Amino acid sequence: MLETKDPAIKLFGMKIPFPTVLEVADEEEEKNQNKTLTDQSEKDKTLKKPTKILPCPRCNSMETKFCYYNNYNVNQPRHFCKACQRYWTSGGTMRSVPIGAGRRKNKNNSPTSHYHHVTISETNGPVLSFSLGDDQKVSSNRFGNQKLVARIENNDERSNNNTSNGLNCFPGVSWPYTWNPAFYPVYPYWSMPVLSSPVSSSPTSTLGKHSRDEDETVKQKQRNGSVLVPKTLRIDDPNEAAKSSIWTTLGIKNEVMFNGFGSKKEVKLSNKEETETSLVLCANPAALSRSINFHEQM
């Protein structure tokens, strides 16, 4: 038979047990303690779970149920009302958000608040109404205030006045923007009248063909009037250029040549000639300064 050895060491007449036996005993004790703790926690949870059905604080209906604990706190159980589709916590405030609403939004940021000025027409109403009377009736039905109706009538009158003054606008109810004509004109078709744009014309002007006599009288008036025509001067022949009448308009005699830029020896002329050349140079200050510089260099 096999002999069972003692799991201990004998040293100097004393038995020293192995440490493995002690570790197994400690692990068994820890497991037992953990089991007792988990059992106690489960008992506490089952005891604190609300079994009583609480009425909804909003609609006072009893169709409520317990959902979960808020933030894993046993003192804040979260309930749900099936009637009004709202959540609330016992001891907290009620959330006014239905299921699937997602993130809460401000009332002012709702898309309907931006379009309060848009009026929606009633259903099953007339599809086409071209007369002004029908439009005024519809507007009076929509707006209960008489001041608004008066404003609409005034706008209609203004729109009619604008169309008579020449602005292209749609007839009927007043539009917020005037209708401008297209940039490119419409090409006329066969047997199709084309409306021409209003042109300011004098009352005496007549449409149609004009006689040639009127054109001749206009040409004679233009000839008799004081119209300056520039004269061309031929420079091929210096004698003809000297005899032309342009020199007289400038105040220079035809007999004497223009000596504005002459040398010092030729400048010594009579006083009359000096005054004439000085007048010409004074008329052109740039030429005067150039002539002075030229004389200084000489």
From Swiss-Prot:
Subcellular location: Nucleus
UniProt region (Disordered), positions on chain: 27-46, 200-231
Function: Transcription factor that binds specifically to a 5'-AA[AG]G-3' consensus core sequence. A flanking TGT sequence contributes to the specificity of binding. Regulates a photoperiodic flowering response. Transcriptional repressor of 'CONSTANS' expression. The DNA-binding ability is not modulated by 'GIGANTEA' but the stability of CDF1 is controlled by the proteasome-dependent pathway. Ubiquitinated by the SCF(ADO3) E3 ubiquitin ligase complex. Binds to the FT promoter in the morning.
GO molecular function terms attached to this record: DNA binding; DNA-binding transcription factor activity; DNA-binding transcription repressor activity, RNA polymerase II-specific; RNA polymerase II cis-regulatory region sequence-specific DNA binding; zinc ion binding
Basic and acidic residues composition-biased segments: 210-219
Post-translational modification, as annotated: Ubiquitinated.
Biological processes per GO annotation: chloroplast organization; flower development; negative regulation of DNA-templated transcription; regulation of DNA-templated transcription; regulation of timing of transition from vegetative to reproductive phase; vegetative to reproductive phase transition of meristem
Pfam families: Zn_ribbon_Dof
Species annotation: Arabidopsis thaliana
Subunit structure of this chain's protein: Interacts with ADO2 (via kelch repeats), ADO3 (via kelch repeats) and GI (via N-terminus).
Gene Ontology CC terms: nucleus
Zn-finger region bounds: Dof-type: 54-108
Entry keyword annotation includes Chloroplast: no
Protein name, per record: Cyclic dof factor 1
Record key words, sorted: DNA-binding, Flowering, Metal-binding, Nucleus, Transcription, Transcription regulation, Ubl conjugation, Zinc, Zinc-finger
Residue sites binding Zn(2+) per the record: 56, 59, 81, 84
Induction of its expression: Circadian-regulation at the protein level, but not at the mRNA level. Strongly decreased expression during the dark phase. Accumulates at high levels at the beginning of the day.
Tissue expression remark: Expressed in the vascular tissues of cotyledons, leaves and hypocotyls and in stomata. Not detected in roots.
